[in-house]
């Protein structure tokens, strides 16, 4: 691919030379633009003058990719910051926003799940695939959802954490708005919803869970053992027994963790495997000598960027994006450039809760070198997988011109391999439902279809319906169950598209959204005043129509079933003593009204009780003796 902008003219070069002559020596961020005014590179510097001038003073000695970039620089702008840490953070934000062509792109696998502890008086703990800056604590990401579910099960078996979604404000609890559920009666929750557990006691439990998730099992076991001994001395044997059960569960968990170091310290291990234009970085999270997790990030558009620079980009990205405890030691595959190392030191220092120096080591022999080698092997493995997937995506694009066409039409950053489409259905404002169908590689994936019975509003309100459906898919329990799509498609026009986009923004999700309006088959995207009109023969339009029609079919089918069920229930609820719940029980047990009508009194009694059973029997057998 070549730059569409022409090379800078003499006037531009003269203006650029003047800017180079007046550059400050402060730390900050610089932006290079081409003749069209497009930002093509963003960088940070400890000394802006020295760093920016180095691009122009060393022409002829630069790597190929850098030399090409410099030939297209027509303008530059700098932002002075008060520290290298500020420059590092600003650079990261600008690269995300501007997506400059010559910057290395770092992409985490956003479909990986995290464990979240919510920022509430009585926090909830669950799996999510979305990291939001909402004050909640996030742990992960976990490469396997099954691994995370095991941890959630462990936490649930040891700690009585609430599973409800109630908003337990002081006012709500004091007013007696909520009642304890089954979890309270089977000792899996202590009933904070009814004020049976104090906020202080609950938060103390959350601190223990955080200690566990940070890999500090030894410290937690010591604290719990001391507490157990204390309760036993106070003759509080029931509480001591509960603590003993917690301790035994923790010991079983600790035994399953892989010991990778004889030193019981905290360290993060980093390595990068590089290919021709792609790379992969892996970090091992080691706590108390045990490997508690790993994470990998893909780096693309790397060109011939030196390995130390790639490693620095990966490490900086990790600590900027991951809300995690800073360890005592960082083990690196290679020495970082001095300027990058100093910026990283300052960043880690600013994020530490304890005042201590983080050690940087580049081991060559022994146990630590073995850890680096193991980390690098994993990076090579993930890079190989990435290259295979990249090749496969290319083959999919060749075999499915519709996906490639759709990518071009909607200006998507990647091939829309996974598309989710929403459609609403109702009858005169009743039985409002929404459907979501999923296409993967241009074909339906019915196991990922979902349907929603909408309840958050009354009457006919298509915008409220779309808001509820999109919120429940991307903000509810499904957010952790299904991977995020490459494109969200709405069966509707500009208004519904904007509603869906607003919901995603509120949830902190940057997902492409488009809508297909029925009448003229126009394509709407958020914040665009005019729709796109594609030829009727367009492969992209045909794919969108197929998605829209399938979502409509799925919604209509579900809506008809609900209406049918309601009609059937109405016949049963017309019988004296049969309410909505009894009708649902009867239908669930017998399968149909006809089967209910043929049942004996004894059979009906097993489901609805003797008195109601006699009433039902008389209704269907009028004139017959029971």
From Swiss-Prot:
Q: Where is the UVR domain?
A: 218-253
Compartments, as annotated in UniProt: Cytoplasm
Q: Record's Gene Ontology CC terms?
A: cytoplasm; excinuclease repair complex
Instruction: State whether keyword Protein biosynthesis applies.
Output: no
Pfam families linked to this entry: GIY-YIG, HHH_5, UvrC_RNaseH, UvrC_RNaseH_dom
> Ranges for the GIY-YIG domain?
25-104
InterPro entries from the xrefs? GIY-YIG_endonuc, GIY-YIG_endonuc_sf, GIY-YIG_UvrC_Cho, Hlx-hairpin-Hlx_DNA-bd_motif, RuvA_2-like, UVR_dom, UVR_dom_sf, UvrABC_protein_C
Q: Known SMART domains for this protein?
A: GIYc (SM00465), HhH1 (SM00278)
What CDD domains would the database entry show? GIY-YIG_UvrC_Cho
**Molecular function terms, GO-annotated:** DNA binding; excinuclease ABC activity
How does the annotation summarize its subunit structure? Interacts with UvrB in an incision complex.
Main role? Answer: The UvrABC repair system catalyzes the recognition and processing of DNA lesions. UvrC both incises the 5' and 3' sides of the lesion. The N-terminal half is responsible for the 3' incision and the C-terminal half is responsible for the 5' incision.
UniProt record similarity statement:
Belongs to the UvrC family.
What name does this protein carry?
Answer: UvrABC system protein C
Organism equals Chlorobaculum tepidum (strain ATCC 49652 / DSM 12025 / NBRC 103806 / TLS) (Chlorobium tepidum)
């Amino acid at each position: 691919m070549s730059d569409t902008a022409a090379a800078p003219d003499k006037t531009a070069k003269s203006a650029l030379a003047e800017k180079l002559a007046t550059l400050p020596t402060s730390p900050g961020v610089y932006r290079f633009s081409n003749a069209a005014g497009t930002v093509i590179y963003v960088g940070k510097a400890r000394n802006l003058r020295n760093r920016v001038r180095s691009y122009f003073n060393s022409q002829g000695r630069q790597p190929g990719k850098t030399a090409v970039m410099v030939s297209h620089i027509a303008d530059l702008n700098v932002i002075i910051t008060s520290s290298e840490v500020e420059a590092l953070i600003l650079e990261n934000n600008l690269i995300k926003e501007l997506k400059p062509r010559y910057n290395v792109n770092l992409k985490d696998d956003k479909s990986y799940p995290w464990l979240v502890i919510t920022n509430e008086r009585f926090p909830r703990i669950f799996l999510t695939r979305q990291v939001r800056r909402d004050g909640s604590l996030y742990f992960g990401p976990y490469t396997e959802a099954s691994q995370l579910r095991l941890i959630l099960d462990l936490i649930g078996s040891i700690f009585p954490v609430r599973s409800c979604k109630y908003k337990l404000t002081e006012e709500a609890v004091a007013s007696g708005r909520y009642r304890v559920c089954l979890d309270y009666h089977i000792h899996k929750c202590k009933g904070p919803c009814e004020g049976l557990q104090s906020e202080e006691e609950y938060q103390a439990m959350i601190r223990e869970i955080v200690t566990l998730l940070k890999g500090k099992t030894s410290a937690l076991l010591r604290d719990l053992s001391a507490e157990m001994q204390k309760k036993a001395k106070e003759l509080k044997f029931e509480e001591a027994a509960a603590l003993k059960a917690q301790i035994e569960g923790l010991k079983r968990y600790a035994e399953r963790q892989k010991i990778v170091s004889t030193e019981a310290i905290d360290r993060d291990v980093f390595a990068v495997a590089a290919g021709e234009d792609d790379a992969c970085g892996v970090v091992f999270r080691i706590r108390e000598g045990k490997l508690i997790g790993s994470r990998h990030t893909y780096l693309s558009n790397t060109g011939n960027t030196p390995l130390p620079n790639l490693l620095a980009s990966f490490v900086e990205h990790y600590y900027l994006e991951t809300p995690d405890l800073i360890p005592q030691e960082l083990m690196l595959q290679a020495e970082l450039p001095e300027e990058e190392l100093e910026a990283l030191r300052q960043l880690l220092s600013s994020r530490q809760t304890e005042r201590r120096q983080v050690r940087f080591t580049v081991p060559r022999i022994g146990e630590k070198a073995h850890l680096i080698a193991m980390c690098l092997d994993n990076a090579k493995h993930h890079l190989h997988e990435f290259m295979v997937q990249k090749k496969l995506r290319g083959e999919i694009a060749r075999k499915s011109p519709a996906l490639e066409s759709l990518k071009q039409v909607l200006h998507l950053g990647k091939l829309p391999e996974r598309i989710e489409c929403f459609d609403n259905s109702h009858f005169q404002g009743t039985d409002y439902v929404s459907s979501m169908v999923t296409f993967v590689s241009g074909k339906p994936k019915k196991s990922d279809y979902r349907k929603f019975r909408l309840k958050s509003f009354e009457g006919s309100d298509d915008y409220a319906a779309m808001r509820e459906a999109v919120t429940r898919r991307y903000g509810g329990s499904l957010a952790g169950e299904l991977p995020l799509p490459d494109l969200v498609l709405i069966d509707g026009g500009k208004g519904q598209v904007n509603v869906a986009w607003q919901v995603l923004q509120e949830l902190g999700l940057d997902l492409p959204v488009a809508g297909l309006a029925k009448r003229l088959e126009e394509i709407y995207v958020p914040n665009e005043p005019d729709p796109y009109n594609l030829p009727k023969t367009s492969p992209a339009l045909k794919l969108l129509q197929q998605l829209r029609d399938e979502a409509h079919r799925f919604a209509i089918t579900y809506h008809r079933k609900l209406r049918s069920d309601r009609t059937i229930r109405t016949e049963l609820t017309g019988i004296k003593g049969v309410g909505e719940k009894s009708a649902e029980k009867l239908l669930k047990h017998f399968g149909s009204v006809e089967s209910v009508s043929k049942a004996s009194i004894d059979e009906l009694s097993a489901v609805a009780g003797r008195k109601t059973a006699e009433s039902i029997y008389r209704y269907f057998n009028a004139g017959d003796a029971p």
